[in-house]
C-alpha cells in the first residue's frame, strides 16, 4: 500500500468524522441512550425479536397474533421520536457511506460514466444496496 493512498484515506476518514451525518448520528444516539423510555422500548423490542427467533428455531409458524405483536412493536419503535430520529440519522449516514463506496467502486472499475453503480441503473456493478 502506498503512502499516497494511506494519506488520501486519512483525509477521507477525517472528512467523514467531521460530516454532519456522523455528528447527527452521534447526537441522536446519545439522546436515545439517555432516554429511559426509549431504552425500555428497545428492550421490549429485543425481547419480542428473541421470542420470534425461538419460535422459528423450533420450526413453529408465526401466528397472526404474533405477527400483529411484532408489527405493533415495530410501530412503537419507529414512532418514538428519539428512536425515530436516531434511525433517520443512521439511514443518512449509511447513504453517505454507500455513496462513497460507489465512488470508490467506480474508480476501481475505471468507469468514468459510473455505469452499474447507481440506484437508477442497479447496483450490480458496485455491490451497493439500493433502497
Swiss-Prot record:
Source organism of this protein record: Desulfitobacterium hafniense (strain Y51)
Q: What is this protein called?
A: UPF0342 protein DSY1594
The family this protein is said to belong to: Belongs to the UPF0342 family.
Note the Gene3D superfamilies from the entry.
YheA/YmcA-like
Q: Please give the superkingdom of this protein's source.
A: Bacteria
Q: Which InterPro entries match?
A: Bact_com_dev_regulator (IPR052767), Com_YlbF (IPR010368), YheA/YmcA-like_dom_sf (IPR023378)
